[in-house]
Amino acid sequence: MAEKKGSSGEKTLYCSFCGKSQHEVKKLIAGPSVFVCDECIDLCNEIIRDELPPSTEARGDSSELPTPLEIKTNLDNYVIGQEPAKRTLAVAVYNHYKRLRHQEKAKKDDVELAKSNILLIGPTGSGKTLLAQTLARMLDVPFVMADATTLTEAGYVGEDVENIVLKLLQSCNYEVERAQRGIVYIDEIDKISRKSDNPSITRDVSGEGVQQALLKLIEGTMASVPPQGGRKHPNQDFVQVDTTNILFICGGAFSGLEKVIDNRTQSSGMGFGATVKSKEQRSLTEVFKEVEPEDLIKFGLIPELVGRMPVLATLAELSEDALVQILTEPKNALVKQYSKLLAMEGVDLEIRPSALKAIAKKALARKTGARGLRSILEQSLIDTMFDLPNTSNVDKVVVDESTIDENKPPLLVYREVAKKA
């Protein structure tokens, strides 16, 4: 390194790259017969920063992306059963985020990978929403859940479809880059089906009209989102969000779809030689396994929307055994949650196997799936939880079959109090 000011007989040194003298730069670093100035070093650092990060970043992201097996294993911790749906979701989500990695380092002449949005079909309480929530939590991406029944066409009372993107932005503190890689779950998508499978000649602002509005959003468009929400109006600033890389998962119970599938798969026969099958022979789960895009169109979804959700996963009706597992096995199982609540009062909770089966049977009778389990358990413990804070020496609360079926109060086990001498 040379000083800027030398003695009168000292030779002036120059940068071997830009040609500036030692007096024109702050520092000059000397090598074997070569000199480089601080400005050229800064320029080299900028070039390296511009060229290297994409490839190294892609390698780092790829290693952090969980495999389909890891995604499914994580789903197993929270969602009981639904093996085919979990495998389908795991592959679809893995491919989606792998596609995003590919886009970051792809060249113009590379194969362009299209987005595959997902449609979940299953009875109420079968785990559609929980699957989407668990996926987003595992991948650490912004997640928002929207209700399709609240959406209307632009210009009508209700929510615009852009409000979905606004909620996604709000979930990540308006970080546009993060929001553009998030997951949107649209629930009750079956409730916006058009009223008949013929094109509508009248305005259907909460059915076919909403489906049309969702088309471009799901496929990928530059959405103009009002930062404060509400309706758009002139002279307003908008946040531009590209929805191309947002993964849309739509879900619905599709009540009545089984009739459409039956009409297609079971041709009615006439005459003595005809085979007539009872529709009661097949469960809802078996019927849903045979769903085709044409059935969804017949049900009331417009063909364009069905085409934009190529990944189709059906969820099975939950059996009594599955509901018992849901009560006890997942990480955030209901029994564990209520045990934790009572432990805060210094009391243990015991729910006997017969009571677990009774809860499952009651939920099946209500046809609410896993969603009905909490209300049944809450109802059986509500009076006990009300009294516990004012009751001393309770050691354990025991719930048996009679508590569920006959609404009898749970059994309270008291601690032995040492008698005073």
Curated annotation (Swiss-Prot):
InterPro entries named in the record: AAA+_ATPase, ATP-dep_Clp_protease_ClpX, ATPase_AAA_core, Clp_ATPase_C, Clp_protease_ATP-bd_su_ClpX, ClpX_bact, P-loop_NTPase, Znf_CppX_C4
Molecular-function annotations in GO: ATP binding; ATP hydrolysis activity; ATP-dependent protein folding chaperone; protein dimerization activity; unfolded protein binding; zinc ion binding
ClpX-type ZB domain residues: 3-56
BP term (GO), one: cell division
TM stretches of this protein: none
Binding site for ATP: P123, T124, G125, S126, G127, K128, T129, L130
CDD domains referenced in this protein's UniProt entry, alphabetically: RecA-like_ClpX
Domain of life: Bacteria
Alphabetical UniProt keywords: ATP-binding, Chaperone, Metal-binding, Nucleotide-binding, Zinc
Binding site for Zn(2+): C15, C18, C37, C40
GO CC annotation terms, alphabetical: HslUV protease complex
SUBUNIT field: Component of the ClpX-ClpP complex. Forms a hexameric ring that, in the presence of ATP, binds to fourteen ClpP subunits assembled into a disk-like structure with a central cavity, resembling the structure of eukaryotic proteasomes.
HAMAP family referenced in this protein's UniProt entry, alphabetically: ClpX
Family matches, as NCBIfam families: clpX (TIGR00382), PRK05342.1 (NF003745)
Function: ATP-dependent specificity component of the Clp protease. It directs the protease to specific substrates. Can perform chaperone functions in the absence of ClpP.
Family: Belongs to the ClpX chaperone family.
Name listed for the protein in its UniProt record: ATP-dependent Clp protease ATP-binding subunit ClpX
